[in-house]
């Protein structure tokens, strides 16, 4: 049986992955766990998400599916933050006999849930049409993520994956400040990067894998393999860990990005990668955000933003000039692209004027007075005007990214970039 669950958390607390870790232990009474649990991030632009818009899936071999359904339902009722308006839990249960027939259908649903917008009624209709067992609470929006997570579990070979070691706090500690040794995270990063990433932000001296909300998560280490994330986790010094789980995830894969041949294709609440030319110089607006415009070959434009949380990435954005050719990726809300990565493909030439050099001694001439040109004091040679010469740009071609402290869950870090033909500038 495959179990998909979503939307049990709220902005104030709880975490669906905690429920997954708990069930992973408890459900062994009714069967055998067949593989790692899944953590599936969905479309990051959805406005009614709680926090990270993540769903989970578990896979077990069992002879008593009804007991599993009853147990999962009971635990959702106990742990879900039902008082929160945005919390609308959903659970889906796929029987083993249906794996083959549902595999392509739910793969398509997964891809749409990550890249597009799905209405609750669409999920409910599909569940009814396919005869899938499910449980929902309140408006049942969690059924969308639950179905998508089941699609991921049915199709593990169809999507790029990473892993996350999630450590959870003792329940009595929930809501209190986390007691962690900051230096141990930097040491874990030193020993395991680039096999792990987003543990810390070196440039901004921040630990980024420790949440600040009142949820049960103590920390989460992301990386390329279960072994690497667990090695990094073993180096962390902190308050006691109640339990932990290693999830297979679609985090750090760029799974959310759609290719856009032209800016006219771009819509709000979707994420894209596209190419264009800087058509309005970067400007810093109130709040410290940096905004500039990009135009495509058809003349369509879109505003692009390096928002204040992207910190040092804004310095790079400010160095762009009119005419620079760039390739961007990010999510669109309110008609503006929130930049996740930027590939500088071609830079326009920058020129400056300087005093001419003496052809005899090679030194720069001095002004001979207003309207009198330039003269070398040593040699007496003259020139009528300044000369125009190429200036060095303070930006190099290559691929850049926002810092770890600003990276979205699905954005692929440059630590994972395998294209040898692109010069990368990882943000550390």
From Swiss-Prot:
Its EC number is 6.3.4.22. HAMAP family: tRNA_Ile2_agm2C_synt (MF_01892). Belongs to the TiaS family. The keyword tRNA processing applies. It comes from the Archaea. This is tRNA(Ile2) 2-agmatinylcytidine synthetase TiaS. PANTHER family: TRNA(ILE2) 2-AGMATINYLCYTIDINE SYNTHETASE TIAS (PTHR40705:SF1). It is found in: Cytoplasm. CDD domains: RPA2_OBF_like (cd04482). One of its GO terms (cellular component) is cytoplasm. Gene3D superfamilies: 2.40.50.1010, 3.30.70.2200, 3.90.600.20. ATP-dependent agmatine transferase that catalyzes the formation of 2-agmatinylcytidine (agm2C) at the wobble position (C34) of tRNA(Ile2), converting the codon specificity from AUG to AUA. One of its GO terms (molecular function) is ATP binding. It catalyses: cytidine(34) in tRNA(Ile2) + agmatine + ATP + H2O = 2-agmatinylcytidine(34) in tRNA(Ile2) + AMP + 2 phosphate + 2 H(+). It comes from Methanosarcina acetivorans (strain ATCC 35395 / DSM 2834 / JCM 12185 / C2A). The gene is tiaS.
């Amino acid at each position: 049986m495959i179990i998909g669950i979503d939307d049990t958390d709220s902005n104030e607390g709880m975490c669906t992955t905690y429920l997954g870790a708990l069930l992973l232990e408890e459900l062994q009474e009714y069967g055998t766990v067949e593989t790692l649990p899944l953590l599936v991030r969905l479309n990051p632009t959805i406005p009614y998400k709680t926090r990270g818009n993540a769903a989970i899936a578990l896979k077990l071999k069992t002879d008593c599916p009804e007991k599993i359904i009853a147990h999962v339902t009971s635990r959702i009722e106990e742990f879900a933050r039902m008082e929160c308006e945005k919390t609308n839990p959903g659970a889906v249960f796929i029987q083993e006999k249906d794996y083959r027939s549902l595999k392509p259908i739910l793969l398509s649903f997964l891809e749409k849930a990550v890249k597009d917008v799905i209405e609750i009624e669409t999920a409910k209709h599909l569940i009814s049409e396919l005869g899938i067992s499910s449980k929902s609470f309140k408006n049942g929006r969690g059924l969308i993520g639950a179905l998508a997570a089941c699609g991921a579990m049915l199709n593990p070979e169809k999507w790029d994956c990473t892993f996350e070691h999630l450590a959870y706090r003792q329940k009595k500690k929930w809501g209190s400040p986390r007691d962690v040794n900051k230096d141990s995270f930097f040491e874990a990063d030193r020993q395991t990067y680039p096999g792990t990433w987003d543990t810390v932000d070196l440039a901004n001296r921040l630990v980024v894998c420790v949440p600040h909300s009142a949820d049960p998560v103590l920390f989460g280490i992301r990386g390329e393999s279960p072994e690497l994330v667990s090695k990094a986790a073993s180096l962390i010094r902190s308050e006691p860990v109640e339990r932990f789980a290693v999830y297979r995830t679609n985090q750090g894969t760029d799974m959310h990005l759609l290719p856009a041949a032209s800016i006219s294709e771009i819509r709000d609440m979707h994420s894209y990668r596209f190419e264009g030319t800087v058509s309005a110089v970067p400007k810093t607006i109130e709040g410290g955000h940096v905004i500039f415009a990009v135009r495509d070959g058809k003349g369509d434009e879109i505003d692009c933003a390096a928002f204040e949380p992207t910190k040092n990435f804004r310095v790079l954005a400010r160095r762009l000039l009119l005419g620079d050719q760039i390739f961007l990726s990010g999510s669109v809300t309110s008609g503006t692209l929130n930049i996740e990565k930027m590939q500088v493909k071609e830079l326009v030439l920058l020129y400056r004027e300087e005093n001419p050099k003496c052809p005899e001694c090679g030194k720069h001439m001095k002004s001979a007075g207003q309207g009198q040109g330039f003269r070398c004091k040593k040699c007496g040679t003259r020139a009528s005007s300044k000369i125009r010469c190429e200036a060095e740009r303070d930006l190099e071609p290559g691929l850049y990214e926002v810092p770890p402290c600003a990276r979205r869950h699905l954005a692929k870090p440059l630590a994972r970039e395998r294209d040898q033909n692109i010069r990368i500038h990882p943000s550390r």
